């Protein structure tokens, strides 16, 4: 299925590219999220007339993400959790806990933006957590996990 991308999408293309994707991916993900439109003749003409406006929107989103990245990079968050001997936590600290702690500290982060490639945190200590604010913008959050009294 031919679609026109309205945003930069990793491993697929950037704004304005006409790409061929599977029908289900287009129908269930790209089109409902406003990241693409079907490549009909009318949509191609509509896109060409709105191209400057869409490029400005993408640039604005990128600038906003970079501004948030500056705040996240400067942020240090501490989470207290119950733990046993040798620093093992009872339970774990996941993406939702990290997002809520960062939001409480003053920087709005969604749990879908938190990247934990090795899974949830299960020990006390200092961690650097990757935050993906935009397809091109990553930030690093300094996280300290301490034992709760």
Curated annotation (Swiss-Prot):
GO terms for cellular component: ribonucleoprotein complex; ribosome. GO terms for molecular function: rRNA binding; structural constituent of ribosome. This is Large ribosomal subunit protein bL9. SUPFAM superfamilies: L9 N-domain-like, Ribosomal protein L9 C-domain. NCBIfam families: L9. The keyword RNA-binding applies. The keyword RNA-binding applies. Keywords: Ribonucleoprotein, Ribosomal protein, RNA-binding, rRNA-binding. Gene3D superfamilies: Ribosomal protein L9, C-terminal domain, Ribosomal protein L9, N-terminal domain. The lineage of its organism: Bacteria, Pseudomonadati, Pseudomonadota, Gammaproteobacteria, Vibrionales. Belongs to the bacterial ribosomal protein bL9 family. It comes from the Bacteria. Binds to the 23S rRNA. One of its GO terms (biological process) is translation.
């Amino acid at each position: 299925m031919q679609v026109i991308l309205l945003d930069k999408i990793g491993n697929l293309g950037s704004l304005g590219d006409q790409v061929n994707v599977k029908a289900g991916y287009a129908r269930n993900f790209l089109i409902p999220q406003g990241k693409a439109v079907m490549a009909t003749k009318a949509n191609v003409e509509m896109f060409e007339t709105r191209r400057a406006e869409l490029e400005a929107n993408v640039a604005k989103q990128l600038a906003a993400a970079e501004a948030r990245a500056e705040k996240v990079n400067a942020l240090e968050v501490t989470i207290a959790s119950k733990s046993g001997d040798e620093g093992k936590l009872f339970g774990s600290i996941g993406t939702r806990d990290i997002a809520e702690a960062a939001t409480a500290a003053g920087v709005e982060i969604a749990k879908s933006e938190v990247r934990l490639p090795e899974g949830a945190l299960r020990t006390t200590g200092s961690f650097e957590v990757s935050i993906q604010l935009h397809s091109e913008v990553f930030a690093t959050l300094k996280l300290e996990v301490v034992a709760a009294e």
